[in-house]
Curated annotation (Swiss-Prot):
It comes from the Bacteria. It comes from Borrelia duttonii (strain Ly). Its main location: cytoplasm. NCBIfam families: PRK14630.1. GO terms for biological process: ribosomal small subunit assembly; translation. The gene is rimP. Keywords: Cytoplasm, Ribosome biogenesis. This is Ribosome maturation factor RimP.
Length: 143
């Protein structure tokens, strides 16, 4: 299977459904082999995100994708998980208020994302509150 890097078409097809339900699209991965299209979507909602809601979303999204795409579609929907690696600056906004492990130099430090901003975020530990630039983050993951 070949991974496809531009997922904007998939995003545009599903963003209205997720937005209405207060759900953030964290990540979309697409793979294609001949006439088969595999789509993996990671979604996040801060509260009341049940398995039943995931099942309903799967049905709604699959119907939208099958109506537009010319391939056989295989769809996986999941949540970020408790130890998700934060992969983009945009995710700091999505996970505001969440506890993270952050690596700036060579050590991890635990704290909370208080507020995400355009160029960085406010990180609160037990002893300090500091602005961290996204460009200084080596690794970050939910904790």
């Amino acid at each position: 299977m070949v991974k496809i890097s531009d997922n904007s078409e998939i995003y545009d097809l599903i963003k209205d459904v997720t937005y209405l339900l207060g759900i953030s699209i964290i990540e979309i991965n697409t793979f294609r082999r001949r006439d088969e299209f595999k789509i993996q979507i990671v979604l996040y909602k801060s509260d009341n995100f049940s398995v039943d809601m995931l099942c309903d979303l799967h049905k709604m999204i699959l119907l939208k994708l099958e109506a537009v795409l010319k391939y056989n579609v295989s769809l996986e929907i999941s949540t970020p998980g408790i130890n998700r690696k934060i992969k983009s600056d945009r995710e700091f906004k999505i996970f505001e208020g969440k506890k993270i492990k952050l690596m700036l130099n060579n050590d991890f430090e635990e704290g909370f994302i208080l507020r995400a901003e355009r160029d960085g975020f406010i990180f609160k530990t037990e002893y300090k509150e500091v602005k961290i630039l996204y460009s200084n983050v080596k690794k970050a993951k939910l904790s």
